[in-house]
């Protein structure tokens, strides 16, 4: 009788331990590889103080480590090739790749690497990190919204995030044509990652 009771207690503890392990696994940090076809880096600048001109960086890459239960363990890395700048005007894009602006020959990447992630509210996070452009690295802090998550038709689990923020291009040494092109650059980044 005593042996049977010990056996039942042992089984109960074992099942409880399994539940704890599996529940912790369910909320462990997950790594997502950015899907370049569904990730956008869009920017806008004001031309002559009159109207906005929009552009984008095609084919951004990177990864997101997301820990829903411990957001401080999350991390983001993202890169875009400066040669992939695209404003839908070939002549302007060629100029943007020149030493006057992105200097794509010498500085092929613009990149961001997070240093901290903090949850602000449901689906909203504060991400601080380093933005590198033209060989200069500057700290930035942005508010990021989790926009959705779920399986795609092929069985991959995807997660989306979006942020909008502004920088001054002069902070990175890009000061050509300051009167004709605004110093302030507004950016929107929409990222979709595939769980690995």
Identify the function of each model-found stretch.
Residues 2-14:
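Bacterial N-terminal signal peptides that target proteins for export
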Residues 11-23:
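Bacterial N-terminal signal peptides
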Residues 27-196:
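Low-complexity, acidic/polar, glycine-enriched regions of mature
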């Amino acid at each position: 009788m005593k042996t049977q009771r010990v056996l039942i207690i042992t089984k109960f503890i074992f099942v409880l331990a399994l539940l704890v392990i599996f529940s912790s696994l369910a909320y462990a940090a997950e790594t997502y590889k950015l899907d370049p076809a569904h990730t956008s880096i869009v920017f806008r600048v004001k031309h002559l103080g009159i109207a906005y001109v929009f552009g984008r960086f095609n084919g951004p890459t990177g990864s997101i480590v997301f820990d829903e239960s411990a957001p401080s363990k999350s991390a983001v890395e993202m890169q875009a090739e400066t040669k992939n700048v695209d404003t839908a005007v070939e002549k302007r894009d060629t100029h943007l790749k020149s030493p006057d602006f992105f200097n794509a020959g010498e500085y092929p990447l613009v990149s961001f690497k997070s240093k901290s992630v903090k949850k602000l509210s449901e689906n909203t996070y504060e991400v601080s990190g380093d933005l590198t452009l033209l060989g200069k690295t500057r700290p930035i802090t942005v508010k990021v919204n989790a926009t959705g998550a779920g399986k795609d038709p092929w069985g991959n689990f995807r997660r989306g995030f979006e942020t909008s923020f502004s920088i001054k291009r002069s902070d990175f040494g890009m000061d050509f044509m300051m009167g004709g092109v605004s110093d302030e650059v507004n950016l929107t980044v929409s990222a979709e990652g595939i769980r690995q």
